[in-house]
Amino acid sequence: MFEHLFAPITINGMILKNRIVAAPTSDLFEEKALGGAAMVIAGHAIVEPGFSSFASSDEPWPFEKYEREAIHERVMGVHRGGARASVEIFHGGLHARVKEYAKGPCIFIREDGVEVRGMDEAMMQETLDWYAKTCAGAVKAGFDSIFLHFGHGWLPAQFLSPLYNHRTDEYGGSLENRAKLPLRILEVVRNTVGPHYPVDMRISASEWVPEGIAFEDVVEFCKMAEPYIDAIQVSAGIDINKVANVHTVTTNLEEEMPNLKWAREVKHAVNVRVGVVGGMLTPQMAEDAIAAGNVDIVALGRELIADPEWVRKATENRPEDITPCLRCSNCYHIASDHWNVGCSVNPRYHHEAFIPAKIERAEKPKRVVVVGAGPGGMKAAISAYDRGHKVTLIEREPELGGMLRFIAKEPHKGEVARLLAHYRAQIAKRDIDVRLGCEATPQLVKSLEPDALCIAIGATERMPGIEGLEGPHVMVGTQAILRAHELGQRVVILGGGSIGCEIALALAEQGRDVTVIEMSERLAGNANSLYREALRQKFELHSNIHVLVSCSCQKIANGKAHYMMADGAEGALPFDDLVVSTGMAARSQESLAFYGIVRNTVAIGDCTKPSGIMNAVYEGHAFALCV
């Protein structure tokens, strides 16, 4: 199984034990190596202190005297895990956080008021010297390879892209001119590390903006770069530009493996190893991509955040045990503006100081009862069982999953369907007493004599007090998901949160004429900014989606939704069906009835406050660790 994925490969003499590389998306380098990745790329090593970092103008050069021990320990950790170690070599160029001025292809003033100076020959030479110095430091630190970032709108990409490069001298205009500085960088790097040291390069196949570099030019540049490099990793988008960034860190609204089509073309054009990153969600996807000859290597980013043991589980033919990435982007600091960064399915991510990598067995097994089998309840039951406890899981519905059962049926929610299948498989593998179709009562729970009780009964769909909602052809969001193919041509959706927008998109793709009414000023206000941008782009592709924001529904009468805009303007929308998606109401009062049975009682997830999968899974796991 997965024989192509786990075949070894060489890159300029360096042997990789399989075709899977850990992309530079997070720390936990040793865990990724222990999890089976053939090579782990540490990110990011800034090239030019004061001019490179997108995090801080004071970020130290990683190979300074007092940084060397830390960087060397990264290498040693990866080697202890049985993998090769690489490091991302990065220059932010005009996007860098700086104290005085930034360097770029052209002179201009950034939106934040920072001056960008067009690089002259002296500035270029200074940058080239820093590239040489940084790559020499990487070699000396023990890295087995270097990974040059030439994509995502960073300095080399800025010179390559007409979006940024408006120069009229020998470094602007034609591709040959725009490629001069990037090629000089590659030449300096190769001369520094020597002919037998593996050099990898990441490139954006498309920048996803009209003025960006053409894919034909990307392929030609890869050919130009071939004498200096040993491998190319194909990505897409621009990191700082949110319109383009949704194609760098894709959401579940985008196709799976979105960059594979470009990587295939690059591979056919060059004679170096070609890899791809982005949306490679399952071992079978990776196996098929390599078996078809489309790429040589796959890079996993968020997939290894969701499950650092992804590779090991695939090696052992246990794909059902892989915790799937949801492509929700909650792990991405830019998406959340650094608020509540985490992983929806891996409670340890960003909480490494508090959540251990391995679940420890409890000193004394206890009886644990979990009421509710949504994502939080299922995670609580699984983790409590792995702690050695005797677990009873009670669910009033005939199936496990809670709200996941409905969300998984949405057209763009294949990742959620995989998560639901994963949790169901994990529970089936464990000797958990699962009671489906069973209404939990305080009396029933008390009869089980629990030592610890987890209340995970979730939330109910909120029905606002609008006149006429009790009429025909009115339904809540979950009903609309299940009955999507039965709905009429004209659909009005009350509520433009993420679920309401997803329902609107699904119906529009089926040809329905959809209008979304949202009280606030923007759609999907409960989603992170990247997901919101992805929804906006999808909506723009559909002329049959209409949006009314800062708008409230006043009443439903005679088959029409009567509304009022913030400025007092009124109107009425005729509909065949109306969907109410105005949020969730926590079942907190129902939860209260279970308190007093046992002192160790904890309510988790949406029954305390509707807050999504990430919070429910984290709290369910944390409950189990404390029992």
Where are these regions (language model features)?
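A short helix-to-beta-strand connector/capping loop
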Residues: 294, 427-434, 470-473, 539-546, ...
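Rossmann-like dinucleotide-binding cores of NAD(P)H-dependent redox enzymes
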Residues: 393-430, 506-551, 608
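Rossmann-like dinucleotide/flavin-binding elements
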Residues: 365-393, 435-449, 457-473, 478-530, ...
